Amino acid sequence: MAPGSWFSPLFIAVITLGLQWPKEAATFPAMPLSNLFANAVLRAQHLHLLAAETYKEFERTYIPEEQRHANKNSQSAFCYSETIPAPTGKDDAQQKSDMELLRFSLVLIQSWLTPVQYLSKVFTNNLVFGTSDRVYEKLKDLEEGIQALMRELEDRSSRGPPLLRSTYDKFDIHLRNEEALLKNYGLPSCFKKDLHKVETYLKVMKCRRFGESNCTI
């Protein structure tokens, strides 16, 4: 079977769900803080799921199994987001204030706004990255949601120093397809990792602020 000619039912379901994301849900009108958090968490969960399934399908389609372990341990696995002091897990996140976590989340989201528009140019399989425009829209929706939360919680007297804005723009989109594929192998992996961080931060904030007994992170 030719690479990219089949996809798992879960991946197809994720893409379908993404395309059906209602436009009216993309806005963040005035609403209770609990609803703002709930909406932001749902958007982050959806994007993380989409990123994880995209990475699986990309790896299954393009990367021979014997190369996967070596590639994951190479420089290609480095993520630019590692250059900012963002928490790496739930325990670390719980040591940060809500505003700090929102600022980290915003930087992570904004670091992807440009590169997601290039994904379909880097990788040849349009079924894997052909929805990059929709992913960009969802990132913008989540960015707006995080900014709305920051406006609600903002305490200007406790603002920290500006964060270094990481970038994924250095990934090369001008190489031949095979070369670009290997050079940029870490891109979908980093996207998945960064969205997982954002989802974790938002869940930590929502759980400790509203004390949900059934909260899972």
Swiss-Prot record:
Coiled coil: none annotated. GO terms for molecular function: growth factor activity; growth hormone receptor binding; hormone activity; metal ion binding; receptor ligand activity. Keywords: Disulfide bond, Hormone, Metal-binding, Secreted, Signal, Zinc. One of its GO terms (cellular component) is extracellular space. PANTHER family: SOMATOTROPIN (PTHR11417:SF2), SOMATOTROPIN,PROLACTIN (PTHR11417). GO terms for biological process: animal organ development; growth hormone receptor signaling pathway; negative regulation of apoptotic process; negative regulation of gene expression; oviduct epithelium development; positive regulation of gene expression; positive regulation of growth; positive regulation of receptor signaling pathway via JAK-STAT. Zn(2+) binds at H46, E199. This is Somatotropin. It comes from Struthio camelus. It holds the Pfam family Hormone_1.
